[in-house]
């Protein structure tokens, strides 16, 4: 088979004046357009953002392993399928082991 990935640099520019750079949102759109129904196919959508993209870029140090750069994005989701289906926002991200962003989860307030 052919290795495929999902990505874009067309965000908030003259050609595409919309978007938020969310690869999870792009994978969800891809799944909707292709009418993806099965969890295995949703997991493939997630793989197109992660290991399939790394393979296309020929990244030898991709993945969580001793000695690798520790690049990771953390989602509040039980599975990759849930992250795609529910368009979950990242809670934190790390580049070379250093935290680069954090998003606090929403908090419901009591009515006054």
Q: What kind of feature is each model-predicted range?
A:
Residues 1-75:
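His/Asp/Glu-enriched, well-ordered alpha-helical/loop segment
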Residues 55, 66-112:
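C-terminal cap of metal-dependent C-N hydrolases
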């Amino acid at each position: 088979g052919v290795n495929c990935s999902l990505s874009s640099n067309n965000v908030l520019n003259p050609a595409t004046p919309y978007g938020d750079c969310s690869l999870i949102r792009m994978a969800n759109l891809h799944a909707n357009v292709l009418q993806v129904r099965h969890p295995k196919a949703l997991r493939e959508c997630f793989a197109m953002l992660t290991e399939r993209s790394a393979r296309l870029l020929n990244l030898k140090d991709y993945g969580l392993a001793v000695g690798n750069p520790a690049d990771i994005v953390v989602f509040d989701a039980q599975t990759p399928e849930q992250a795609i289906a529910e368009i979950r926002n990242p809670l934190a991200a790390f580049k070379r082991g250093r935290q680069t962003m954090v998003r606090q989860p929403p908090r419901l307030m009591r009515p006054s």
